[in-house]
UniProtKB/Swiss-Prot annotation:
Classification via NCBIfam families: rplO_bact (TIGR01071)
Keyword Cell membrane annotated: no
Gly residues biased stretches: 21-31
Origin: domain of life: Bacteria
Protein name: Large ribosomal subunit protein uL15
Segments of this protein annotated with the region Disordered: 1-54
Gene Ontology molecular function, alphabetical: rRNA binding; structural constituent of ribosome
Encoding gene per record: rplO
Natural source organism: Klebsiella pneumoniae subsp. pneumoniae (strain ATCC 700721 / MGH 78578)
Length: 144
């Protein structure tokens, strides 16, 4: 069997109706568009969100919030991720080398999620209270 010899089962693919091909086809003349009006014209129709002149929903509702630029360069690291880092020192460069965070990340915080299995030294990262306790309980240390 070859890919170029495969074909769908007989009768499983029904041909689409061809529009504007005579009265007997059932879709001749107006081709399913009805008579006149904006939607019958070529390229006709209203833009997305248009409600016939009524104030549209997206303009009735208030704007809110913003996207923090700092959030784009900040990452959360789980305790379980620390096991994937080569060596005993965990810092930004080690996390980037292990593909745990992206290259654009400038700040990171270790959070208590999962468990740390070996002693590691966390350098230059922020650490939550729970994560700090877990790292120190495993024999590791945190350097600011």
């Amino acid at each position: 069997m070859r890919l170029n010899t495969l074909s769908p089962a007989e009768g499983s693919k029904k041909a689409g109706k061809r529009l504007g091909r005579g009265i007997g086809s059932g879709l001749g003349k107006t081709g399913g568009r009805g008579h006149k009006g904006q939607k019958s014209r070529s390229g006709g129709g209203v833009r997305r969100g248009f409600e016939g002149g009524q104030m549209p929903l997206y303009r009735r509702l208030p704007k809110f919030g913003f996207t923090s630029r700092k959030a784009m360069i900040t990452a959360e690291i789980r305790l379980s991720d620390l096991a994937h880092v080569e060596g005993d020192v965990v810092d930004l460069n080690a996390l980037k080398a292990a593909n745990i965070i992206g290259v654009q990340i400038e700040f990171a915080k270790v959070i208590l999620s999962g468990e740390v299995t070996r002693p590691v030294t966390v350098r230059g990262l922020r650490v939550t209270k729970g994560a700090r306790a877990a790292i120190e309980a495993a024999g590791g240390k945190i350097e600011e």
